[in-house]
Structures are given as structure tokens and as C-alpha cells.
Amino acid sequence: MATSQRKILVTSALPYANGPIHLGHMLEYIQTDIWSRYQKLRGHECHYICADDAHGTPIMLKAQQLGLAPEEMIAQVNKEHQQDFADFNIAFDNYHSTHSDENRVLASDIYLKLRTNGYIKSKSISQLFDPEKSMFLPDRFVKGTCPKCKSPDQYGDNCDACGATYSPTELINPKSAVSGATPVMKDTEHFFFDLPAFEGMLKEWTRSGALQTEMANKLDEWFEQGLQQWDITRDAPYFGFEIPDAPGKYFYVWLDAPIGYMGSFKNLCDKRPELSFDEFWAKDSKAEVYHFIGKDIVYFHSLFWPAMLHGSGYRQPNSVYAHGYVTVNGAKMSKSKGTFIKARTYLDHLDPEYLRYYYAAKLSSRIDDLDLNLEDFAQRVNSDLVGKLVNLASRTAGFITKRFDGKLAKIADTTLTEAFLAKQEQIAEFYETREYGKAMREIMALADIANGFVADAAPWQMVKQDDQQEAAHQVCSNALNLFRILVTYLKPVLPRLAQDVEAFFQQTLTWDGLAQDMAGHEISPFKAMMQRVELDKVNAMVADSKENLQVTADVPKTAKPEKTVESSNVSSEPLVDDPISETINFDDFAKIDLRIARIVKAEHVAEADKLLKLQLDIGGETRQVFAGIKSAYSPEDLEGKLTVMVANLAPRKMRFGMSEGMVLAAGPGGSDLWILEPHEGAQPGMRVK
């Protein structure tokens, strides 16, 4: 249990209910979920809340296009969103919708309090009106030429080319994005929130530590420009909540959207009577509230939202944490390149734990954009999770099960355990401050130490000697205890792996239990916990993303797909590229002695571009082999693996040393090489027949 239990409410921005979740969205939900899981792991009371943002003109128009009622469409999208999040192991405590009774009541309550307190003004404005559709046009439904830089085809609120903001009436040659008609000006009465009245309060709050420094600096620019009255009104037809005492007038979506955080929590409180809504949202609340958002919506969350809360008698959030955008392979996500990847498309091909880890490994507390480099993604997951983390257990657990009754030994030398536990507070601080990348580097550095310990001790050699049985038991038990500590550290990031490891150890992994004495503890037989990322699956995901676009655009599916992962040169017809060799007789083949070998150690060779130096255990002896697989594997990917070698190949003297055999690999070369990996039941020294 945590020393001092905190009460925490944490939210992610509400996804808009007019389309699917994609990998750009997933960055935020993974970031927030890791933080929420960490808080719970430390024993704090933490509630992770979200909802669909379900109002606005875009939803109304899309529902019309689909021939659905808006309520029907948002219900379908909500179901899809929740399934995608669940399959990515995003553990919301409540997921709701802004189109709810709770949100309607709270939005009206906040509006009426603001009106009573004198913060709502009414005035007549002239607005663009679509004469063909008989509707007023929101900013994003007017397009024209930017009045500042003269770039064409820009939205009615800001220019993507120069970043300028303006009103739709300032556009040059405006057109309705709904019908294409030239809009006309029409007068209408709108209600405005008096944002300038909160300038002093907002300047103090934005510099209180509630925002990252970069965001606080950006807000200073907006303060210098002067805060403006905020139009919170939209005219019918509109899908949203009608404003009290104003028939035909609706709340602008950005008024009720952040109130959706409160609405979702109220819904949770109604389901769990022990929870108090006021304990988290009252002005004198001692609980903590944190919002995780993208950098594109900072203005709403750091100016309008805290001002609305303050003006209506509610508390402000402790912090608003913004993150950057996701790029793929160094560029903006692209539908034509297949890098605009939907969450569901990813899930059809790859393990969600892979992306959770990769995002965590690259996330910091800053607002920098994050690049999902698909080649680096595969290499990092294979190296860190498969080659370092899971490999630590896979190469030692079998000995405990088969030779030591499945029970761990009392560890005599606890030096490594103490070193691992000494990193506990540092890793905790990294999680708390959202420096996940630093936490992952710290954890993987420990994994390197643990794997080096196992490689140096070589328990697979010890078990062959009668007088080394206890030493082997010690080494394997020590390694598994270190593995347990590592996975506990990673539990917020890899919840599914943590569950598998909990089943393996037959106990729950807890932060407070990190230092537990595991002597005599019985483990379950080890089962494979994570597979390598194969580039063909990554390529298939990218190809499917293109195919989805082609279907949407009604492009023939027979179009030849572009190459996906740039480093991949794998032919779909290997026999054409590399025909079968001439026939040999059996006697010639029988001369080749193929043996199972375990890669005990792998290291780079100085001044060699293609070679790795391998130390191979073939049962009764150790061989040194230089293998031309550097372009496909990192040394840490290989250590502990079983492979196949030619054991009776004449030694070859090389500039770097003597090579005493050859390991077998398949593939055309470059990064497209795969060493042969026998079934785990094979043992070093066994002959391949």
C-alpha cells in the first residue's frame, strides 16, 4: 500500500464519434493508461475516465449521409471505440458519451451558474448561412482563401498554411463545405462566455505548474493578443444540447465536450455509491484531477475549461499534460502510403503490447512529436521484449521445472537483487513525471545485466556436472527473481504480459512485493509469452491500410501495392530468385554434420560491417563462429537462442580470429535474414538428421 494514498481522477481527451480510432489517437490512451495503471500499482485510488465526444455538425451530417439517426450512429461508433480500447488493454474505469443525461444536466447547470454570475452575454451577430441547406455554417464548414497568406482551400477558422486564425467572414471567396454554395450573411442572436473576465485568474493558473513550460509560453502569446468573448452558441439544425431558455439555440460542442469528463465520472458515481462526485469536483476538493490531451486542443483545455469551472464554482484541474503528434516512418500519417493505420487494422496483425512498449520507450514529459518507425519498431520489440526480457525466463525456467521440482532456491548472493531494487524509486519517479522513455531505458539496462549474469554463469553447462547442481539452481532462481522484478516494473506498460508472468509465478506482482523472498516458491511450467515481430506482418498491416483506403475510394483492388517496409527485399517467389541447386547423392549429404547449438554470447566485430562473433555451446564444447548476420540481428537478440550449425566444417582463419563452423540462416540477405531456430525441446549437441 502506498505510504499516503492519493485520490486521483485522470482523463484522456474524448475521441470524436464520427470515425474509427487510429494509431495517432492510441498514443494518448496508452500514455494515460500507463500513468493510471502505475498509480493503482502504487496503491492510490485512481479513476481513469473517458467518453465519446458525440455532438456537433460533422456528426449530424455524417449520420444523414449514412441514412441513420445521429443517436444510432454514435451508439455504433461508441461500441467500436470501446472494443478497440479494450483490445489495446486500455483499462478505463468508465467510458461514457457526451450525449447523456448526466452531461445534459451538468452542461445546463454550469451554463446557468455562469449566467447568474454575469459571465454570459447575448448579442446579435452576422454569420454565414448556406441558402441551399438552410443552415448556419460552423467555422470548419466554410472554405476559402486565407485572408493573410492567400492560400486557397482553407477552413473558416484557421489556415493550415500560415497558422493564422480569423473568422469565417474574413475568408476570400468563401464556399459552403456542405453544398458548395456561396454562403450569404444572416443575422442571429448568440450567447458569449466572457473569457476576458478571467484573464488574471488564467495567467496565474497557467504559470502555477499546471502546464508544461512550452504550453505556458504559448499561452503567453495568446494573452498578449488579448482574450476574446467566446461564442458558445450554434443554431438549429444542430445535434447537441439545447441551451436553457433559448429554443433553437444549442451549446457549441466545445462547451459540453470537456464537461463530458464530469458527466462520465458522475455516471461512474451513480454506479458506485461509495464514490462522491463532489469530493473530486467541488471547489475545495483535495482530490487530484489530471487531463491528458494532444497539443492541438491546449487552447480549449487551458483557457476556456478552467475559466468555465472557476466561474461556475467548480475546482480547476491540477495539471493538463499535452503530447505531440504521431508520425510514421518520419512523415505525417498517410492513407496513400498505408501509414494511416487504424487501431483495428493493427490489432488484426500485431500484438497490442508491442505498440504499448514502443510508445512508452519513446515518450517523455515534453510535447515533441513521436515517430513510429516501423523497422525500428520491429527491431526494438524483438531486442528488448523478446531478446532481453522474456528470454531471461525462457532460458532458465526449464531447468527449475525439470531438475528442481519447480521450486526456487534461497539466493545466497543477493547483490544483483539489491541493485535491481535500488532502482525502484528512480523508476517510480520516471513514471510519475511521464518520463516513460527514461524508465524503459533504466529497466532494459537492468535486463542487460541480468542476461549477462546468466550468460557468464551458463547454467546449461552447470547442470551437466553433478557438483554444480546447487550452483545451477542458484543461478536460475536468481535470474527468475530478477525477471519478476523487471516485469513488475513494466506492469503498467505490459499488462497482458504481467498477467502471464503472474500465472507463471502463481502470484500477483505488486510494487510493495518487489523485495519478497522467493525461496521455496513454486513456479508453473514456462510457456511462450511473446513472439518476435515479423516484418511480413508489419508489411501486411500497411498493405491492408492501403487496401482499406482503396475500397473507400472505389479504386480497383488489383492495383499493385507499393513496397511497405523500405528495408524489406523479401521476394514472394524465392525459387525464381534462387533456384534449387544441382542434385547430390546421399553420401555427399551425410558428410555434413549439423548440430543444435545455443548462442551463449554474441558481440560486434570491430571494423567488420557484416559480421557478429558468436560463442556457441554444442553440448560438450564451445565453438567460435563469425556469422554474416549483423544487418539482421543485434547481439542481444541472439544470446540464449538455439540455432543449427555445421559442426564439421573445416576451421577458417579470418582477420578477426578463427571461425569454427557455420550457423544456418534463410533469406536473401541484408536485414532479411532469419537464423534457424529449432523447437525448444532440442538440446545443444543433438544431431540434426
Swiss-Prot record:
What's an example GO cellular component term for this entry?
A: cytosol
Q: What residue intervals hold the motif 'HIGH' region? A: 15-25
Tell me the GO molecular function terms.
Answer: ATP binding; metal ion binding; methionine-tRNA ligase activity; tRNA binding
Catalytic activity from the UniProt record: tRNA(Met) + L-methionine + ATP = L-methionyl-tRNA(Met) + AMP + diphosphate
Instruction: Check the record and name the CDD domains matching this protein.
Output: Anticodon_Ia_Met, MetRS_core, tRNA_bind_EcMetRS_like
EC main group: ligase
The entry's ATP-binding residues are: K335
Occurrences of domain tRNA-binding (ranges): 588-689
* Record bears the keyword Ribosomal protein: no
What's the EC number here?
A: 6.1.1.10
Q: Which residues bind Zn(2+)?
A: C146, C149, C159, C162
The entry's keywords = Aminoacyl-tRNA synthetase, ATP-binding, Cytoplasm, Ligase, Metal-binding, Nucleotide-binding, Protein biosynthesis, RNA-binding, tRNA-binding, Zinc
Q: Where is this motif: 'KMSKS' region?
A: 332-336
Q: How is the cofactor bound?
A: Binds 1 zinc ion per subunit.
- Cofactor(s) essential for the protein: Zn(2+)
Subunit: Homodimer.
Q: PANTHER family given for it? A: METHIONINE--TRNA LIGASE, METHIONINE--TRNA LIGASE, CYTOPLASMIC
NCBIfam families listed in its UniProt record:
metG, metG_C_term, PRK00133.1
Q: What does the protein in this record do?
A: Is required not only for elongation of protein synthesis but also for the initiation of all mRNA translation through initiator tRNA(fMet) aminoacylation.
Q: What is this protein called?
A: Methionine--tRNA ligase
**Natural source organism:** Shewanella sp. (strain W3-18-1)
